[in-house]
Amino acid sequence: LLYLRCNLPFNKVLVNFIVFYLYLEMTNKKEISAAIIIIGNEVLSGRTKDLNTSTLATWLNSLGISVGEVRVIPDVEKTIIDTVHELRVKYNYVFTTGGIGPTHDDITAESISKAFNIEYGFHKEAFAILEKYYEPGNFNDGRQKMAKMPVTANLILNPTSGAPGF
């Protein structure tokens, strides 16, 4: 399961990481499928335009990975958990965007932790990355929240905003 920060353009580091990871998987499987989950009340209400679905689906299909489904869901814990559980049994990969920022309604990371029964807390490496990214005195509680995720997560570096995905 890979998570991308909401509505940020794909960067080369992220793309290279995912290409390498999926290449390793593709060498062992004949057909690979994926689903995309867009998480956010702001997308459902129309306040924020989803900029990732087309880019991600086009890119995955160009790699020979068939995108079988795209869903837009609200920032609701049960909905996130249920959707992840449903799609992960149908597809080889589930990509998500949204819901892992600094605001109170960004609950994706915690919901994913619960879905996989993994401890949720400050990820030491993510915390260090963010602490270094922000100037002294600007690494407030909201920004620190972006370092909370499944504690065993593998990070996807994000030079655009500093906040790593996982």
Regions found by a protein language model. Give the residues of each.
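N-terminal small/polar loop signature for handling phosphorylated ligands or for N-terminal nucleophile
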Residues: E31, S54-A115, K132-E135, M146
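Short hydrophobic targeting helices and cationic amphipathic motifs
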Residues: L4, L8, L14-F17, L22-L24
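Glycine- and acidic-residue-enriched helix-capping/strand-helix junction motifs
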Residues: I39, V43-T53
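Proline/glycine-rich low-complexity loops and linkers
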Residues: I107-F166
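Conserved hydrophobic helix-helix packing surfaces used for dimerization/oligomerization
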Residues: A34-I36
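Short glycine/serine/threonine-biased micro-segments
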Residues: I38, L44, T96-G99, T103, ...
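Eukaryotic N-terminal low-complexity, Ser/Thr- and Lys/Arg-rich leader segments
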Residues: M26-K30
